[in-house]
Amino acid sequence: MNLIETLEQEEIARLGKIIPEFAPGDTVVVSVNVVEGARKRVQAYEGVVIAKRNRGLNSAFTVRKISSGEGVERTFQTYSPLIAAIEVKRRGDVRRAKLYYLRDRSGKSARIKEKLPARKIKTAAV
């Protein structure tokens, strides 16, 4: 590991942010700190993760939602101080790392199958 990677790892540890495990296809709620004049409030942004970029401190992810019938995408820096919290609502079962094809789809064709937790297999007693 080189010096820059070491410094980035130290900075991530110093930030102490709790980032849940999520992947493309998952539906997440990102709580964003919004400053309007002197007021500061938290705004929730819920949508499907269509891309994730893992680059240490420069990691980012893109969330897509449909707002008033129009597709809206927003890219968030994972370790940004503007992000208050990230909550995973549901796990999506997809076979791609980047879900850019969802941009061309709407309605039922844009649905993502839910990933169900693995069932425990009972072994026969011998």
Curated annotation (Swiss-Prot):
Short name of one Pfam family: Ribosomal_L19
Disulfide bond entries: none
Domain of life: Bacteria
Keywords for this protein: Ribonucleoprotein, Ribosomal protein
Alphabetical GO biological process terms: translation
GO molecular function: structural constituent of ribosome
GO cellular component, one term: cytosolic large ribosomal subunit
PROSITE patterns: RIBOSOMAL_L19
NCBIfam families linked: rplS_bact (TIGR01024)
Role summary: This protein is located at the 30S-50S ribosomal subunit interface and may play a role in the structure and function of the aminoacyl-tRNA binding site.
Protein name: Large ribosomal subunit protein bL19
Organism, as annotated: Albidiferax ferrireducens (strain ATCC BAA-621 / DSM 15236 / T118)
